[in-house]
Curated annotation (Swiss-Prot):
The gene is CVCB. Seed storage protein. GO terms for cellular component: aleurone grain; vacuole. This is Convicilin. The lineage of its organism: Eukaryota, Viridiplantae, Streptophyta, Embryophyta, Tracheophyta. It comes from Pisum sativum (Garden pea). Belongs to the 7S seed storage protein family. SMART domains: Cupin_1 (SM00835).
Length: 386
């Protein structure tokens, strides 16, 4: 008997646990937080009766809407109390209106400062223009009118900042100013690079290194600066000078001779060189690249018979009387230049008269010719031929 009870005890214990679990499950299902009925049908009937009761006393609304209305009412009461408190301490206004008023004040203050600054700049600009007119009373009328138009335009621009067309014009003017400044900077940089290149390359001679000895509509004669002034590399060439000749078609360089040895080189074009001697004359046809040497004192002239191409040549001048100094004697310009090389006795014997008379008649005329040359009254050295 005892053995039978012991063998059945675990089974009874398991059945008891299952029974308790089922009772607890049924109890939990029938009770929801201890507030609603056990049966779903009873809960539904209770809800319907509650709604009918609320409808009799007033309009019915769900519970969550009532809670939202209560919160909104609390916020409204708090806002009204805050407004009353602000009214007691001073003039009241909504917070967003206060912020807008502050922004409006800042904007108005900024506009006033900007207008004051523009008026100040305009006044200063007009005063400077007035001072310039007083300092420069001889200015042209159109320059004064341009200044006045510029002042009016700036005034109109300051008054019409909000005009789209005015803003477009201002933007165009600023872009043009920036473009001009950029071009100016590029020009300056190019000039600096050119100068640096010239310093790096002493063998490069620009056109501004030449001195114009003669120029007219038919051509020019130019003298290059001394080589030793260009660089220390040319110190041994201080006794050498370079002369450039240019002549248009159908022109002639009038006869002359120079107190220096010449090495003539044709750079472009064709020429006929005629060399005069006491008993004869010789002519040479020269083309590009031809070179010829003329001794000091040789009288010669050049002709450009080409119909289209200009004649351009250079002379390497080697003075014989002084280092780096030479003089050209032009027969057509001043015949009395030849008298400089003769002494007083030779002149008296040649002209069979007193030196004072020779000096008065010939040398004074030579001095007048020299003064006329200094004043720019040069006789043509290059003339047109038919």
């Amino acid at each position: 008997m005892a053995t039978t009870i012991k063998s059945r005890f675990p089974l009874l214990l398991l059945l008891g646990i299952i029974f308790l679990a089922s009772v607890v499950s049924v109890t939990y299902a029938n009770y929801d937080e201890g507030s609603e009925p056990r049966v779903p049908a009873q809960r539904e009937r209770g809800r319907q009766e509650g709604e009918k009761e609320e409808k009799r006393h007033g309009e019915w609304r769900p519970s969550y809407e009532k809670e939202e209305d209560e919160e909104e009412g609390q916020r409204e009461r708090g806002r009204q109390e805050g407004e009353k408190e602000e009214k007691r301490h001073g003039e009241w206004g909504p917070s967003y209106e206060k912020q807008e008023d502050e922004e409006e004040k800042q904007k108005y203050r900024y506009q006033r400062e900007k207008e004051d600054e523009e008026e100040k700049q305009k006044y200063q600009y007009q005063r400077e223009k007035k001072e310039q007119k007083e300092v420069q009373p001889g200015r042209e009328r159109w320059e004064r009118e341009e200044d006045e138009e510029q002042v009016d335009e700036e005034w109109r621009g300051s008054q019409r900042r909000e005009d789209p067309e005015e803003r477009a014009r201002l933007r165009h003017r600023e872009e043009r100013t920036k473009r001009d400044r950029r071009h100016q900077r590029e020009g300056e940089e190019e000039e600096r690079s050119s100068e640096s290149q010239e310093r790096r390359n002493p063998f490069l001679f620009k056109s501004n290194k030449f001195l114009t000895l003669f120029e007219n509509e038919n051509g020019h004669i130019r003298l290059l600066q001394r080589f030793d002034k260009r660089s220390d590399l040319f110190e041994n060439l201080q006794n050498y000078r370079l002369v450039e000749y240019r002549a248009k078609p159908h022109t002639i360089f009038l006869p002359q001779h120079i107190d220096a040895d010449l090495i003539l080189v044709v750079l472009s074009g064709k020429a006929i060189l005629t060399v005069l001697s006491p008993n004869d004359r010789n002519s040479y046809n020269l083309e590009r690249g031809d070179t010829i040497k003329l001794p000091a004192g040789t009288t010669s002239y050049l002709v450009n018979q080409d119909d289209e191409e200009d004649l351009r040549l250079v002379d390497l001048v080697i003075p014989v009387n002084g280092p780096g100094k030479f003089e050209a004697f032009d027969l057509a310009k001043n015949k009395n230049q030849y008298l400089r090389g003769f002494s007083k006795n030779i002149l008296e014997a040649s002209y069979n008269t007193r030196y004072e008379t020779i000096e008065k008649v010939l040398l004074e005329e030579q001095e007048k010719d020299r003064k006329r040359r200094q004043q720019g009254e040069e006789t043509d050295a290059i003339v047109k031929v038919s």
